UniProtKB/Swiss-Prot annotation:
NCBIfam families given in the database record: fabZ, PRK00006.1
Broad EC category: lyase
Family note: Belongs to the thioester dehydratase family. FabZ subfamily.
InterPro entries, per the entry: FabA_FabZ (IPR013114), FabZ (IPR010084), HotDog_dom_sf (IPR029069)
Source species of the chain: Deinococcus geothermalis (strain DSM 11300 / CIP 105573 / AG-3a)
Name of the protein described by the UniProt record: 3-hydroxyacyl-[acyl-carrier-protein] dehydratase FabZ
Catalytic activity, reaction form: a (3R)-hydroxyacyl-[ACP] = a (2E)-enoyl-[ACP] + H2O
């Protein structure tokens, strides 16, 4: 598959600024995804988290992983179908994510049955694991 640029990402995700946390999908095939989030100093959360030492909030890294997870289903969902976050298991944060980092988002579909799904995810910066989590989601008409 060709990489999906932001225009394509916005066709799949219902999110809009300031909550789009996937900038590009490098690959999405066989239930596995590799996506990118370019973390810039202009992110709206940095002035408050933290003013003297900006760090991307862990919950937003998890949200980025959840958004990337939706591309595990690329081409399988009916138009107007949305994935809703249903749970997060085993979230661990191992490295700070700061302005200038390129956050690589990896997701692998474990299952999708009766509108419920689960992905195993990790986020990396410079080849180091920044976060890991299992994402649970429900798929329904938006």
């Amino acid at each position: 598959m060709e990489p999906l640029l932001i225009q394509d990402v916005l066709k799949t995700l219902p999110h809009r600024f300031p909550f789009v946390l996937v900038d590009r999908v490098l690959s999405a095939q066989d239930g596995e995804v590799h996506a990118l989030k370019n973390v810039t100093v202009n992110e709206p959360f940095f002035p408050g988290h933290f003013p003297q030492e900006p760090v991307m909030p862990g919950v937003l890294i998890v949200e980025a992983l959840a958004q990337a997870s939706m591309f595990c289903l690329h081409g399988q969902l009916e138009p107007g179908t949305v994935g809703y976050l249903a749970g997060v298991e085993g979230a661990r944060f191992k490295r700070k994510v700061i302005p200038g980092d390129q956050l690589h988002l990896y997701a692998k579909l474990d299952f999708l049955r009766r509108g419920l799904g689960k992905t195993t995810c990790r986020a990396e910066v410079d080849g180091q694991v920044a976060a890991e989590a299992t994402i649970l989601f429900a798929v329904a008409k938006g």
